[in-house]
Amino acid sequence: MITSIATTTAGAFEVKSLGFIPYPSQPKRIFFMAQVIFRILAIAFAVASISAMVTSDQNVIVFGMDTAARYSYSSAFRFLVGANAVVCGFSVLSLIFVCLMSRRSEAILEKNYYLFLHDMVMMVMMVSGCSAATAIGYVGRYGEKEITWTAVCDFVGKFCNQALVSIVLAYLALFCYVALTTLAAHKLNHSSSTAAIRQNE
């Protein structure tokens, strides 16, 4: 038994001395791949949502008057674009952070906490942006008869359709961050349990 342990320790020392990083365990590898995939998807959905919204401008003639529909006329749509931009930027930074964390052989509780906090803030921001844009989009498409607000999508169909696509893409980015927050919470809980066990030993 002592010989086996010594051999294992020597082998590990030789691997580290040659500069190789030990191959991560299966759960850690799955967690890393899920983090990378969901962050890349969140970036892609956020960029696509911004593109759909900023290119949704439409000029139409209504009752003989030249009318323009632009996302910048709505504070809710501007907020959604801003939220997508912030989430996209921080997703790139967090992707780099996750890749750097994966190079360490041991989980660090403090860094897992920061990752969880980041993902939760991004999720809340996307919830705010999607909720605001959905409310305005609903009124624009269906109107509000009780207060005599008329639906405008019958006149500016292109604008409304692209705004709808943008909102759907933003929701997909939101779902990515719901998954990331869940993963980060699970990882944080696991790291806390591991740290507590080591402290009691």
Curated annotation (Swiss-Prot):
<keyword id="KW-1133">Transmembrane helix</keyword>
<feature type="transmembrane region" description="Helical">
    <location>
        <begin position="120"/>
        <end position="140"/>
    </location>
</feature>
<feature type="transmembrane region" description="Helical">
    <location>
        <begin position="79"/>
        <end position="99"/>
    </location>
</feature>
<feature type="topological domain" description="Extracellular">
    <location>
        <begin position="141"/>
        <end position="162"/>
    </location>
</feature>
<keyword id="KW-0812">Transmembrane</keyword>
<feature type="topological domain" description="Extracellular">
    <location>
        <begin position="51"/>
        <end position="78"/>
    </location>
</feature>
<feature type="topological domain" description="Cytoplasmic">
    <location>
        <begin position="1"/>
        <end position="29"/>
    </location>
</feature>
<feature type="transmembrane region" description="Helical">
    <location>
        <begin position="163"/>
        <end position="183"/>
    </location>
</feature>
<dbReference type="InterPro" id="IPR044173">
    <property type="entry name" value="CASPL"/>
</dbReference>
<feature type="transmembrane region" description="Helical">
    <location>
        <begin position="30"/>
        <end position="50"/>
    </location>
</feature>
<keyword id="KW-0472">Membrane</keyword>
<dbReference type="GO" id="GO:0005886">
    <property type="term" value="C:plasma membrane"/>
</dbReference>
<dbReference type="Pfam" id="PF04535">
    <property type="entry name" value="CASP_dom"/>
</dbReference>
<dbReference type="InterPro" id="IPR006702">
    <property type="entry name" value="CASP_dom"/>
</dbReference>
<feature type="topological domain" description="Cytoplasmic">
    <location>
        <begin position="100"/>
        <end position="119"/>
    </location>
</feature>
<protein>
    <recommendedName>
        <fullName>CASP-like protein 1F2</fullName>
    </recommendedName>
</protein>
<dbReference type="InterPro" id="IPR006459">
    <property type="entry name" value="CASP/CASPL"/>
</dbReference>
<keyword id="KW-1003">Cell membrane</keyword>
<feature type="topological domain" description="Cytoplasmic">
    <location>
        <begin position="184"/>
        <end position="201"/>
    </location>
</feature>
<comment type="subunit">
    <text>Homodimer and heterodimers.</text>
</comment>
<comment type="similarity">
    <text>Belongs to the Casparian strip membrane proteins (CASP) family.</text>
</comment>
